[in-house]
């Protein structure tokens, strides 16, 4: 046990987390040079392309330290984005230490701070590392001062290294061994293992990535998952050295995988505790919570006959992403599709992109919404997570929207612009505290304002330094209305949005003018209207395309021309009655991007 070190790497996007991981794997000889490639642990194409880590990955490495002893290092690579903060907290709770990687040229950034606070709360030993010191712009003194100032941990002995060139990486490992405590736990106790992550493999079913806290697990043991109570026989256990390698047993302190012929990923919930049926653990490990989707959107296939394929693709994605929820829904404008729940906007984009890329789906996505509580005149209360299901305004007594408590951390230079942003988003300030140069702001903001683009706007007004985390507080009565879009008098249900009354006029006008730019001109006039109930708040017209029917007339009587023009007019009128306007895919996407100015 004394020679095991479990650690993860915390870093902001692009501070060199995956490159450092590559170097560590190379030094410890986890892969031969032939198998070595950039970003070994980011196995999804999408992860490589966006340069982000989505799923947690692990590598069990052995390293002979300078004191001559052989240490087992278990590296758990964590995602860094706020949408995946639950995944981060579970990866961290499986470790005793974390390498805090800070770009020496950029200093501390927001997501580093958020994840670092999570680590400190979980009692993880944080080891600061300055990366990219080979850059001419590197300023290690400033970065050290920032770590001490912002995060408040002692960084005087932060290890400088450059993951790209490989210099100093061994010093990082030495610092890790010196500072991070070995895992606690007793191999003789009943089994308790924390599920860090789980994914579906086409050959063996669900693979669970676990950290054994107490006890020992061998193949042929029967295990029970404590959140669901389901029982399975264990087929294989082992570790990843990034390649998988079967072992005889996994015991306390180790990080490895369990394969137990589980067919459904929903059975192996991330954060759940695994124990054995015989000699079961009395209680599960703390910190497990069901992940609730925060953002809903409709996903529809562009071709109606792709509906079954979309359902299969969602099922397959669900195998690897337990936080994705979906249920079938029908829209008049878009046909059959699914209402999906996501953790946040990045999660939504990633799911969409994976559907398009890995499963060749063509998708239409509706605007993201949150769940509203609607009290009707007859006294019943319904939950509305889809604008199309919002009752008529005449039947509504009041609408309550979800309010979240948002904690924001930022350097004091940006306080003004962040406060302005929160006020625009109808936020109410609850608290404000100064910690050195850092400021903590607490706001109550309607969730509907946050899902649209709050995070991106926050990052841009604070140059990426502000970090936020939010939790649901309550439902609160609010003056929100549903804005419907009509095209030639027909309601397009997929374009309905629920907004606050103060923004409804603006929003309606914006969407209408956006649609006017995007919908191609037809052979007849098209009227675009935005309405609240029966009240029209904005209108745009798309003028008809017309053929020049007079081109063939030379001279001659005016009545001849009039006859041709009248005939054209008649035809247009007839067309308008039978014609339907196709809304191109871009229109939906553009409408999602109508920002609240």
From Swiss-Prot:
Q: Which GO terms describe its cellular component?
A: plasma membrane
Where the protein is mainly located, per its record?
membrane
Q: Name one GO molecular function term.
A: GTPase activity
In which compartments does the protein localize? Answer: Cell inner membrane
Which reactions appear under catalytic activity for this entry? GTP + H2O = GDP + phosphate + H(+)
Domain tr-type G, first and last residues per copy: 2-184
Looking at its record, which EC class is this enzyme? hydrolase
Q: For this protein, what is the EC number?
A: 3.6.5.n1
Q: Which UniProt keywords apply?
A: Cell inner membrane, Cell membrane, GTP-binding, Hydrolase, Membrane, Nucleotide-binding, Protein biosynthesis
| Highest rank taxon of the organism | Bacteria
GO annotation (BP), single? positive regulation of translation
Q: Which SMART domains match?
A: EFG_C (SM00838)
Give binding positions for GTP. 14-19, 131-134
Name the membrane topology term. Peripheral membrane protein
Instruction: Note the NCBIfam families from the entry.
Output: lepA, small_GTP
Its biological purpose: Required for accurate and efficient protein synthesis under certain stress conditions. May act as a fidelity factor of the translation reaction, by catalyzing a one-codon backward translocation of tRNAs on improperly translocated ribosomes. Back-translocation proceeds from a post-translocation (POST) complex to a pre-translocation (PRE) complex, thus giving elongation factor G a second chance to translocate the tRNAs correctly. Binds to ribosomes in a GTP-dependent manner.
* Protein's name in the database: Elongation factor 4
This protein's species is Paraburkholderia phymatum (strain DSM 17167 / CIP 108236 / LMG 21445 / STM815)
């Amino acid at each position: 046990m004394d020679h095991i070190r479990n650690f993860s790497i915390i870093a902001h996007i692009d501070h060199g987390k995956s490159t450092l991981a590559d170097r560590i794997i190379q030094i410890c000889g986890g892969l031969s040079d032939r198998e070595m490639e950039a970003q070994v642990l980011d196995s999804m194409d999408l992860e490589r392309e966006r340069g982000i880590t989505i799923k947690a990955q692990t590598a069990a490495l052995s390293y002979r330290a300078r004191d001559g002893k052989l240490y087992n290092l278990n590296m758990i690579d964590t995602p860094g984005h706020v949408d995946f903060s639950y995944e981060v907290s579970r990866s961290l709770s499986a470790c005793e230490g974390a390498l805090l990687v800070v770009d020496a040229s950029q200093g501390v950034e927001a997501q580093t701070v958020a994840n670092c606070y999570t680590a400190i709360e979980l009692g993880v030993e944080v080891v600061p590392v300055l990366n990219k010191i080979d850059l001419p712009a590197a300023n290690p003194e400033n970065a050290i001062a920032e770590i001490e100032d912002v995060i408040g941990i002692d960084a005087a002995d932060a290890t400088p290294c450059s993951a790209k060139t490989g210099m100093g990486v061994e010093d990082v490992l030495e610092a890790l061994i010196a500072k991070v405590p070995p895992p606690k736990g007793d191999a003789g106790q009943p089994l308790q293992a924390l599920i860090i992550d789980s994914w579906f493999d086409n050959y063996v079913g669900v693979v669970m990535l676990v950290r054994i806290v107490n006890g020992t697990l061998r193949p042929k043991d029967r295990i029970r998952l404590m959140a669901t109570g389901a029982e399975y026989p264990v087929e294989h256990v082992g570790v990843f050295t990034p390649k998988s390698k079967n072992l005889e047993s996994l015991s306390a302190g180790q990080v490895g995988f369990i394969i137990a012929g589980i067919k459904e990923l929903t059975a192996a919930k991330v954060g759940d505790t695994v124990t054995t049926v015989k000699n079961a653990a009395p209680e599960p490990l703390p910190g497990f919570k069901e992940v609730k989707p925060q953002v809903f959107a409709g996903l529809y296939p562009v071709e109606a006959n792709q509906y079954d394929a979309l359902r299969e693709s969602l099922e397959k994605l669900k195998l690897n992403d337990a936080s994705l929820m979906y249920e079938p829904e029908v829209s008049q404008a878009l046909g059959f599709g699914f209402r999906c729940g996501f953790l946040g906007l990045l999660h939504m984009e990633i799911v969409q992109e994976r559907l398009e890329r890995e499963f060749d789906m063509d998708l239409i996505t509706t605007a993201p919404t949150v769940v509203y509580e609607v009290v009707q005149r007859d006294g019943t209360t319904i939950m509305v997570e889809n604008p199309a299901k919002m009752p008529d305004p005449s039947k509504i007594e009041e609408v309550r929207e979800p309010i979240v408590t948002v904690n924001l951390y930022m350097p004091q230079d940006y306080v003004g612009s962040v406060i302005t942003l929160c006020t625009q988003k109808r936020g109410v300030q609850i608290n404000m505290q100064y910690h050195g140069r850092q400021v903590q702001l607490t706001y109550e903001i309607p969730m509907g304002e946050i899902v649209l683009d709050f995070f991106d706007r926050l990052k841009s007004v604070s140059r990426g330094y502000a970090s936020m985390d939010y939790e649901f507080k309550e439902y609160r009565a609010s003056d929100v209305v549903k804005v419907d879009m009509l095209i030639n008098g027909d309601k397009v249900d997929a374009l309905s949005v629920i907004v606050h009354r103060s923004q409804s006029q603006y929003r309606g006008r914006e969407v209408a003018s956006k649609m006017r730019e995007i919908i191609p001109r037809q052979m007849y006039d098209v009227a675009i209207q935005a309405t609240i109930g029966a009240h029209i708040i904005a209108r745009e017209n798309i003028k008809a395309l017309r053929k020049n029917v007079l081109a063939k007339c030379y001279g001659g009587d005016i009545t001849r021309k009039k006859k041709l023009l009248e005939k054209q007019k008649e035809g247009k009128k007839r067309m308008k009655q039978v014609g339907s306007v196709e809304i191109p895919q871009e229109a939906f996407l553009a409408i999602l991007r109508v920002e609240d100015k």
